[in-house]
Amino acid sequence: LANTQSLSLNAGTGGAIAASSTIGTGTSLATLTVTNSNGATFSGAVTTGTSVVLTDTTDATAITFNGALTTPTLTTAAQGYNLVLNGGATITNAVSFAHTGTLTLGNDAADVLLFDGGLTATDPSGVTLNGTVRTSGDAVSLGDGNTALTLAGTTSIIDTTNNGGTAAGAGITLGGAVDGTLANTQ
């Protein structure tokens, strides 16, 4: 029954969501939705066949994926929560991060986040990169005048050729300030 069942999580504004194991890795879910929470942590890998929808979480609290996130579509609503993708990711369709809290892409140099259709992150209040962001020949736009990019690892990579698989690549736009976290180490 792969891709036929959905899970919607609503802990209200006072309750946290904690998933300590994998979700959808044995048989993928159709959709995972976080309707509301006072923070959500997914410790294991999350796999869906259709989408992951992040509707709302209390402002300045985080929705955190510590395992790999695999989904065709990732949708974030224009709310003030933070989003943390720590375990790598494979997302098929273009992603436009609409949430207005912070965005963290990776927490280790070995993390690889493939946004196969490209990505735009100009609405978050700040973007932190540690690891590799890849696309398969699709554009990447990180930051704007109000959204800085912070490099958290010693080497951060933005690669629109998917490690050479799409030789032509695509444009990379860094629209805001780009800084490291430790002087002379990034």
Q: Where are the model-predicted features located?
A:
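Extracellular lectin-like interaction modules
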Residues: 1-186
